A protein has these predicted regions:
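Aromatic-lined carbohydrate-binding surfaces of glycoside hydrolases
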Residues: 1-20, 64, 86-87, 134
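Short, solvent-exposed turn/loop segments enriched in Gly/Ser/Thr/Pro and often Arg
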Residues: 1-2, 55-63, 212-215
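Active-site and substrate-binding clefts of carbohydrate-active enzymes
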Residues: 14, 95-136, 140-350
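Acidic, His- and aromatic-enriched active-site or binding-groove loops in soluble protein domains
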Residues: 15-35, 72-117
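The substrate-binding groove and active-site-proximal loops of carbohydrate-active enzymes
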Residues: 20-35, 51-59, 134-149, 180-187
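CE4/NodB-like, metal-dependent polysaccharide N-deacetylase domain
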Residues: 27, 31-58, 154-175
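Short, surface-exposed basic-aromatic patches at helix termini and helix-loop junctions that form
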Residues: 48-49, 65-80, 190-203
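Beta-rich nucleic-acid/ligand-interaction surfaces
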Residues: 60-67, 86-90, 216-219
Length: 355
């Protein structure tokens, strides 16, 4: 369902990176749901790929110290996210770059770090190089494959030249998440990718590797972070999914529906099949994309469609159990005149209905 795992774990984590965020009246706090989302994602990957992944890119690169154990429990050896997470975890403002966009301290960024769990199954975290990755995602499509690959190799060699001596090779993580870059490339990026991989594999001062190979070889030398800062790959917070009024309504709707499911599950009124179906809809409603389109920071041009789909998933939780969905789920969240919050009574109110 592509959830923002730290927010499913606890919406209060949003305030760590955004102290001014408007938090839901009803705190969403379901660590078990976050763990199930990880398990089901890996189950699906195993079904499709024929083997269980040993690493993963969490949805939107959203991570926090609180969710690391969920990856370890499922046998995940490494995850990846954006460089903002590392800079905030190390309490530095940002990674400085020279005029060519090259990180001035590559020995910090170009290495995985262990997210400390105080046991043997610590999870290694690889951090995306923002500059090089964004060049692939947004710039190289306007260049010939030859010019684009030459520019990438120039950046990699420059990073190598400014590196200090380490006891192991540096590793550069180039990651694309959701940019839909290839449709903007000539020949869908095939020419660029073919030349890029050919160049990477024939350059004598560079070696391609997988995260698993790297940590198997150099794991004992990898340092540990004291704590992983809660953030996503492209910003040092979760502000795209929480913190604005519309997003607050959506999280409150989600929490109210989840509380209803808990009551239903604790009763003897429903069959196991009904409860399983209702919970599947609940997990789908926890996906990040519904919250992405709420608020003023993102616009699809048709936000009503996504808002309606989100509310329909919540309705399906009720209807799967043979119950009538509450009337407030018929009222669009994006209509500011349609609902008010009664902060004092800790409930959601609409213009004509209270929960």
């Amino acid at each position: 369902a592509h959830p923002i795992l730290p927010l499913i774990f606890d919406t209060n984590l949003a305030a760590v990176g955004d102290i001014g965020a408007e938090l839901p009246t009803n705190r969403f706090n379901k660590p078990t749901d976050a763990a199930i989302q990880v398990e089901k994602g890996l189950d699906l990957a195993e079904k499709l790929l024929g083997q269980r992944p040993t690493g993963m890119w969490p949805a939107e690169g959203a991570v926090s110290q609180e969710v690391l154990g969920m990856f370890a429990k499922e046998g995940v050896k490494w995850i990846a996210t954006g460089e903002h997470v590392l800079s905030k975890s190390l309490d530095i403002p940002t990674f400085k770059r020279n005029t060519d966009g090259i990180v001035t301290n590559p020995e910090v960024l170009y290495t995985p770090w262990y997210g400390q769990l105080n046991r043997q199954d610590d999870v290694a975290i690889f951090f995306r190089d923002l500059s090089i990755s964004d060049q692939v995602g947004f710039t190289y499509s306007g260049m010939s494959p030859e010019m684009a690959v030459a520019d990438m190799m120039k950046a990699l060699e420059a990073a190598r030249e400014v590196s200090t001596t380490m006891d192991r090779p540096l590793v550069v993580s180039i990651v694309l998440d959701g940019e839909n870059a290839w449709e903007h490339y000539q020949n869908d990026g095939i020419d660029f990718l073919s030349l890029m991989y050919e160049t990477l594999t024939t350059t004598d001062w560079l070696k391609t590797t997988t995260p698993t190979e790297y940590i198997e070889k150099y794991g004992p030398q990898i340092e540990k972070l004291d704590r992983v800062f809660p953030a996503s790959w492209f910003q040092p917070n979760f502000a795209t999914w929480i913190g604005e009024t519309e997003e607050t309504y959506a999280w409150d709707y989600l929490q109210k529906t989840r509380a209803f499911y808990d009551r239903a599950n604790a009763s003897d009124n429903y069959t196991e099949k009904q409860l399983e179906q209702a919970f599947d809809y609940m997990l789908l409603a926890e996906g990040s994309d519904w919250f992405w389109w709420y608020g003023s920071d993102q616009s699809s041009g048709n936000d009503d469609y996504f808002g309606s789909a989100f509310r329909n998933l919540l309705k399906n939780v009720y209807s799967s159990l043979g119950e009538e969905p509450p009337a407030y789920l018929d009222i669009p969240i994006i209509s500011p005149s349609a609902q008010l919050f009664d902060k004092q009574s800790d409930s959601i109110l609409t213009s004509n209905q209270s929960l």
